[in-house]
């Protein structure tokens, strides 16, 4: 199993709020709905040299309390299901309907009463050829994912 870890990210919310949101994926629904039509977000995406039409893909994301699924090019639907929760510390996911067997952990730790930090770890069953082709992309993707999760306004969800 190949292992990829993000850098540690600071979060401007207490660990209890972060855990409450990430351990119940249904709580992300309002944020996804708002993001689809957010002009300020579209402008930021343009500034980053990306196509804001990518936000349209958010309508294809399916959420339940324990599962998130989304279409993936050339693969079909990919899903992550929560398989373990450790109160205010960790949420562990497992891939479903994915060509690659993988587990993903989101670890949260308190820093102060009002802030916390997080790190994401991905363990994926990759053959050597695939690892060579996508390893660096997974490393960057996990780090970008952690940065994105650290920016969620947990105190307002």
Task: List each model region and its residues.
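Beta-strand/loop substructures that line and gate deep hydrophobic ligand-binding cavities in soluble
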Residues: 92-144
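Short, surface-exposed coil-to-beta transition loops
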Residues: 4-6, 75-80, 100-105
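Hydrophobic pocket/interface hotspot
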Residues: 18-22, 28, 82, 120, ...
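Intrinsic-disorder/low-complexity, polar/charged segments enriched in Ser/Thr/Lys/Arg/Asp/Glu/Gln
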Residues: 2-8, 67, 77, 90, ...
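A short, structured loop/turn motif at beta-sheet edges
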Residues: 12-15, 83-88, 107-117
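Short amphipathic alpha-helical signal-transduction/dimerization elements
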Residues: 26, 138, 142-157
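Hydrophobic ligand-binding cavity/cleft-lining segments
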Residues: 1-62
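Glycine-rich portal/gate segments that line the openings of hydrophobic small-molecule binding cavities
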Residues: 41-96, 155-156
């Amino acid at each position: 199993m190949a292992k990829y870890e993000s850098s540690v990210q600071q979060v401007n919310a207490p660990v209890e709020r972060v855990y409450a949101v990430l351990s119940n994926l249904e709580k992300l629904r309002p944020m996804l709905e708002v993001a689809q039509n957010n002009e300020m977000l579209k402008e930021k995406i343009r500034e980053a040299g990306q196509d804001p039409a990518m936000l349209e893909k958010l309508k294809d994301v399916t959420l339940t309390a324990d599962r998130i699924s989304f279409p993936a090019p050339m693969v079909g639907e990919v899903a992550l299901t929560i398989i373990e929760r450790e109160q205010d510390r960790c949420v562990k996911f497992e891939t479903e309907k994915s060509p690659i067997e993988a587990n993903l952990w989101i670890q949260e730790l308190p820093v102060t009463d009002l802030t916390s930090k997080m790190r994401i770890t991905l363990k994926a069953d990759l053959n050597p050829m695939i690892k060579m082709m996508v390893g660096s992309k997974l490393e960057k993707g996990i780090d970008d994912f952690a940065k994105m999760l650290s920016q969620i306004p947990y105190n307002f969800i």
